[in-house]
A protein has these predicted regions:
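Sigma70-family region 2
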Residues: 9, 49-64, 83-84
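Intrinsically disordered, low-complexity regions enriched in small/polar residues
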Residues: 18, 30-32, 52-55, 70, ...
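Arg/Lys-rich amphipathic alpha helix in sigma70-family domain 2
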Residues: 74-84
């Protein structure tokens, strides 16, 4: 049973990494068009990826994972703009 759980966790880890590899450039470009400072855009990207990680159970079943990530980035950009 423990081995199966470990294998499932490893599969989830690999799937999450694949999703991020496939979408990181898209997300960064999306953010960079709205936040011109590269350092701040990287911060927003990292916050977006952190939320994706925290919500992985929801995200892995989502029918439009890229859309989920972009919407998350959009909300993080709004948060950023409220602070400035």
């Amino acid at each position: 049973m423990h081995k199966k759980k470990t294998e499932e966790m490893e599969a989830d880890h690999q799937e999450f990494n694949r999703l991020i590899r496939e979408n990181q450039a898209i997300l960064y470009d999306f953010i960079k068009c709205r936040i011109l400072d590269k350092s701040l855009a990287q911060d927003v990207l990292q916050e977006t990826l952190y939320i994706a990680y925290k919500k992985w159970d929801q995200l892995k079943e989502h029918p439009n994972q890229t859309g989920f990530l972009i919407e998350t980035a959009r909300y993080k950009i709004q948060d950023f703009n409220k602070k400035t």
